[in-house]
Amino acid sequence: VFEFSKKAYLKEISRARTFGFLKDVQALRSMGLALGGSLENAVVIDENKILNPEGLRFENEFVRHKILDAIGDLALVGAPILGDYTAFAGSHDLNHKLTLSVLADAKNFELVDLTAEVVREYQKVFA
């Protein structure tokens, strides 16, 4: 369970690299994707081993990167979300479908004006 705060994000999530399989690199590049990818900014997996000489930054770096993806994807809603998020095998596609589903009906969400006190508490989390 990850409890969001700016400090926790910087320490536990922001350094988690994207990851992919060596067998997919050529196909991705031929489609104009992953052009800036390297062993410095991505974890590359071949068969059952990590190719990066230094290994993983965190034992669960893949999970942490999925959290990073979810934070970025859900930020595209355009307003802070106060709520819980749980995913199994999360992906950009799944996050996109979630966002579309939530925004499809105004009954699925509530826009609220926060009191000054709540705003101050919220700002502490991101300070």
Predicted segments — roles?
Residues 1-127:
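C-terminal regulatory domains involved in ligand/effector binding and gene-expression control
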